Structures are given as structure tokens and as C-alpha cells.
Amino acid sequence: MGMLLDGKVEDTQLGAFLMLLRHKEESAEELAGFTEAIRSRLSAPAIQVDLDWPSYAGKKRHLPWYLLAAKALAASGVRIFMHGGGAHTAGRMYTEQLLEQLDIPSCDDWQTVEAALAKHNLAYSYLGNWMPALQRMIDLRNTLGLRSPIHSLARILNPLGARCGLQSIFHPGYQAVHRDASGLLGDNVIVIKGDGGEIEINPDTTSHLYGSTGGVSWDEEWPALSAQRHVKPASLEPEHLLALWRGDVEDSYPQLALLATMA
């Protein structure tokens, strides 16, 4: 991974490596090793953070209610660092597209991250601002025609060493691998299969939590909060996020999703 980050391989070698790793599937040990290589190249200052909140998937069936959960937690004093890799797939709604509307600070460097956390307890930063080599690998998705393991790796980074890392892995079988990788790194983590691949509990289904605390793995099963499934909206209207945040509308699905995600 160090050679990839330092630009010491050809583009064809990089693509071949990523696709081979995707085919064989990355192990917890490999993910932990890759993360160590990335962290050793970060120049992040010591900034106290409670939650590391990666946001790389985007939503397509429901609005990104997790953003309101993050805002509510920040308002209660929880310091949250969010990071993402841009709107890389058509037809999905990404965190970056809603930052201004929801008054979430978008930070270009670590100094503005620190200032935003001091003022708002919430800061977002684009991966390309602080690890451009990794962002370039994510951007190869359209060229390669496949999601590479870098999309998974970005969720483990926890670049500021938050007290707890949150991760959402949508594809079955990968959640435990991510939990184990974070455990190997000495991080406290909670991994879920969040709605759309984002850190958002779906209140209509049972949720399994894969955790690691102090190097000890644990599992929890959370029951569905709704007795029946909600009908998915015909379209995603960002104004509905704002209306719910202001208390102008009642909507059981996002209200339950917010409660479960904040818990």
C-alpha cells in the first residue's frame, strides 16, 4: 500500500492490484496493514474527536436522515468528524451535496476542521483534501467498472483517532472483517449494515451491531422499531430533511431512523 500511496506504481499495476484484491476479498489483517500505511502518511494534528463518521456510499431509497442524527448528536455535545469521497455514482444523494443546506461545515484543511469542531462539534472534510492518493483510487471506480476495496478501506481510517469509529458496510459478510480490522488497530468501533451503506439504522428491519471495545469483540441484535415496513418515497426531496429538522412535518420513518441511529 505504501508504494501505491507514494505513486511508485504504474496505473495499470494499480488497477490490477485493486481488482485482484477485490476478487480474492481483503482480510482483516490486510485492511489493518493498509490503514497503518495511510495513517503513517497523514499530517493530522491532535484533535479531540468522539465519533469518526465516514460517509462514502450515498443514499438512493431514502433521504440521508443520518445527517440529522449527526447534527442532533453534535448539538448535545458529541464531537463528530465526518469524511467522504465525493458524489461518484449517479442516482445517489451524497453528504457533500447537502452540507450547505444543513449548515454542516465543509473543511478544506485540518485547521478549519479544528475550528469547526470547536464551534459546532461537527465537521466534514473531503478525503481528497487530506489523502489525495486514496481519493484517486476511489475515483478509478468508473474506469475499472467495479467497486474496489478502497471504498471499504476509507471507512476504517479514523484519521483523527476518535474515541469510537462508526462504519456501515452494506454487503453481507464484510461487517465482521471490518470490526476485526479495527480491533487489530486498537480502535473502538461499531459496524452496521446501514441503510444504503451509510451509518443509518433502518427501523423496519432487525439490525446487527458488530463491535470492538478495548480489543474485545462483541455483537448485539437490535429489533425492528416498526411493526410493518414503511413505503419508500417516490422521490427524494432535500426540503423534507429541513422540514423535519424544523419540526414542520411528522414522518414516522425518519423519526424512528433518527432515534435508532443516535442510540
Describe the predicted segments one by one:
Residues 17, 69, 178:
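Aromatic/hydrophobic pocket-lining residues that form π-stacking "cages" and hydrophobic walls in ligand
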Residues 13, 65-69, 95, 174, ...:
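Catalytic-loop motifs flanking and including active-site residues across diverse enzymes
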Residues 34, 39-45, 101-107, 112-261:
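Glycine-rich anion-binding loops and their surrounding alpha/beta cores
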